[in-house]
Swiss-Prot record:
One of its GO terms (cellular component) is cytoplasm. It catalyses: O-phospho-L-serine + 2-oxoglutarate = 3-phosphooxypyruvate + L-glutamate; 4-(phosphooxy)-L-threonine + 2-oxoglutarate = (R)-3-hydroxy-2-oxo-4-phosphooxybutanoate + L-glutamate. This is Phosphoserine aminotransferase. The lineage of its organism: Bacteria, Pseudomonadati, Pseudomonadota, Gammaproteobacteria, Vibrionales. The keyword Metal-binding does not apply. It is found in: Cytoplasm. Catalyzes the reversible conversion of 3-phosphohydroxypyruvate to phosphoserine and of 3-hydroxy-2-oxo-4-phosphonooxybutanoate to phosphohydroxythreonine. InterPro entries: Aminotrans_V_dom, Aminotrans_V_PyrdxlP_BS, Pser_aminoTfrase, PyrdxlP-dep_Trfase, PyrdxlP-dep_Trfase_major, PyrdxlP-dep_Trfase_small. It comes from the Bacteria. Binds 1 pyridoxal phosphate per subunit. Pyridoxal 5'-phosphate binds at A80, R81, W106, T157, D176, Q199, N241, T242. Pathway: Amino-acid biosynthesis; L-serine biosynthesis; L-serine from 3-phospho-D-glycerate: step 2/3; Cofactor biosynthesis; pyridoxine 5'-phosphate biosynthesis; pyridoxine 5'-phosphate from D-erythrose 4-phosphate: step 3/5.
Length: 364
């Protein structure tokens, strides 16, 4: 039986929901794109039609993030995990270490990959405040004097932890923004490298973005695959090999959609409203709990637990029947998780809160 998609809200952590308007446009254009009689998936990545798609996508992203001219925007393959290797291979130079700030699972995953190429200097920034998980302020991070760069993950999707400040350092700051890019305003000029897997706030899986400051290009001293070499990708305009053209095209549509919403500043206002609505309800309830201190709560990923964990399966089943999809928490932490990326409308979060109220009344 076909479900009314107007009443379905997808809370998946990634691949995540795409804006409905983007999906509808892609659907309309799928078979006959721009009157060519073919799909955008079927044309050459070096055709003038696709070159225009690529150039517009880059310019729109530059506009949205106010990216300075001395940064390259690279459309990469391999997702953020490929960047876990690309970062040390491109940035270490003659150095033997880099400082990695450990704020959670994904930061730790980056460390494990970096160990293949250097001896990471790991600073554990995790702490507790009033019995809740938190992260030490950046002013307290210890950065090795000999570090080639400082790497951190501003948003941990699994734990629902967000880091909102930056250290004062002369080292290049590298940020894995896979789950937070385009969700709030940032000053790109404070970073050396920003990278992000696409499948949360950019587009479908299969592509990643790397924003690299010009002076960090060409530093690689180690042998590294050309496909991961920032300098090669910059020189070839992200077309060293055949790129994932459909993912690139869809990402471009998302950028245009976001500009139509008023840009990052406007979407940040909506994102803060969505997060406040959900956190406020959880905090006033004795039936639901979020274990992250308010100072480090994620705007994008809201994990929560039931007072009666034995009801988890029932909660998920009934939520799914209401059109509230993909609320199961990550296997590492269990419970529930609502991922409320840019494409999630306020109405979706309100529908979730209404369901949570109803469930609490029936099962508390």
């Amino acid at each position: 039986m076909e479900q009314n998609t107007d009443n379905v809200f997808n809370f998946s952590a990634g691949p995540a929901a795409l804006p409905k308007a983007v999906m509808q446009q892609a659907q309309q254009e799928l078979i006959d794109w721009q009157g060519l009689g073919t799909s955008v998936m079927e044309i050459s990545h070096r055709s003038k039609e696709f070159i225009k798609v690529a150039q517009e996508a880059e310019q729109d992203l530059r506009d949205l993030l106010n990216i300075p001219d001395n940064y390259k925007v690279l459309f990469c393959q391999g997702g953020a995990r490929a960047q876990f290797a690309a970062v040390p291979l491109n940035l270490l130079g003659d150095a033997e270490t880099a400082t990695y700030i450990d704020g959670g699972y994904w930061a730790e995953s980056a460390v494990e990959e970096a160990k293949k190429y250097c001896e990471p200097d790991v600073f554990d920034a995790k702490t507790e405040i009033d019995g809740k998980v938190a992260v030490l302020p950046a002013s307290e991070w210890k950065i090795a004097p000999e570090a080639a760069y400082v790497h951190f993950c501003p948003n941990e999707t699994i734990d629902g932890i967000e880091i909102n400040d930056l250290p004062i350092t002369d080292k290049p700051i590298v940020a894995d923004m896979s789950s937070t890019i385009l969700s709030r305003e940032i000053d790109v000029s404070k970073y050396g490298v920003i990278y992000a897997g696409a499948q949360k706030n950019i587009g479908p899986s299969g592509i990643a973005i790397a924003i690299v400051r010009d002076d960090l290009l060409g530093m690689a001293k180690q042998v590294l695959p050309s496909i991961l070499d920032y300098k090669v990708l910059a020189e070839k305009e992200s077309m060293f090999n055949t790129p994932p053209t459909f993912a690139w095209y869809l990402s471009g549509l998302v950028f245009k959609w976001l500009k139509a919403q008023g840009g990052v500043k406007s979407i940040e206002t909506v994102n803060r409203e969505k997060a406040k609505l959900l956190y406020d309800y959880i905090d006033q309830s004795d039936f639901y709990r979020n274990g992250v201190h308010p100072s480090n709560r994620s705007l994008m990923n809201v994990p929560f637990q039931l007072a009666k964990p034995e009801l988890d399966a029932t909660f998920l089943e009934l939520a799914d029947a209401k059109g509230l999809k993909a609320l199961k928490g990550h296997r590492v932490v269990g419970g529930m998780r609502a991922s409320i990326y840019n494409a999630m409308p306020l109405e979706g979060v309100q529908a979730l809160v209404d369901f949570m109220k109803e469930f609490e009344q029936n099962y508390a």
